[in-house]
Regions:
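Hydrophobic transmembrane alpha-helix bundles
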Residues: 4-15, 77-90, 114-120, 132
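A C-terminal functional module that forms or caps the active site or interfaces directly
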Residues: 54-107
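Mid-sequence, gly/pro-rich, charge-dense loop/helix-turn segments that line enzyme active sites
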Residues: 1-69
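Conserved active-site and cofactor/substrate-binding residues in soluble primary-metabolism enzymes
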Residues: 22, 26, 60, 76-80, ...
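A structural motif corresponding to the C-terminal end of an alpha-helix
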Residues: 34-42, 81-90, 124-128
């Protein structure tokens, strides 16, 4: 999103007073704790996720976005969840399974990654619901 010509920050949604939509702190802490318990074989990282209107497959573009917006990852859906939750005063959390770094270093094919991500996500979601 680039509405800088209208006085908004780059990335800011016009007519929105917020530039980013922080996740609920309690949900964030719970997800980090639970993920380490039910999925000890994966790494858990916390930070801003940058959302945009394009699939990023170029390392230079990814690095520029992360540098400019202070993000940890780049994707296409999270901001819509954050915006809807923010506008409706609903606590939210976005959890992402990162398939690759947009630099050719992916260590498994997408079908294999997809199955692992589904398994990890189900374990995380079930345990989080149990603990809420």
């Amino acid at each position: 999103m680039d509405a800088t010509g209208f006085g908004y920050k780059k990335g800011q949604i016009p007519q929105m007073d917020e530039f980013s939509f922080p996740a609920d702190e309690n949900l964030r802490k719970l997800a980090a704790k639970v993920c380490q318990e039910v999925n000890p074989e994966i790494s858990v990282f916390e930070g801003r996720i940058c959302s945009g209107d394009q699939f990023i497959s170029d390392k230079g573009v990814k690095d520029a976005i992360i540098s400019e917006f202070g993000g940890f990852a780049v994707e296409m859906e999270g901001a819509a969840i954050g915006q809807a939750a923010y506008l409706n005063h609903i606590p939210f959390l976005v959890v992402r399974a990162i398939s690759d770094k947009a630099d050719g270093s992916a260590n498994m094919d997408y079908a294999e990654f997809e199955m692992a991500a589904i398994e990890h996500s189900v374990k995380l979601t079930v345990r989080m619901i149990q603990e809420l």
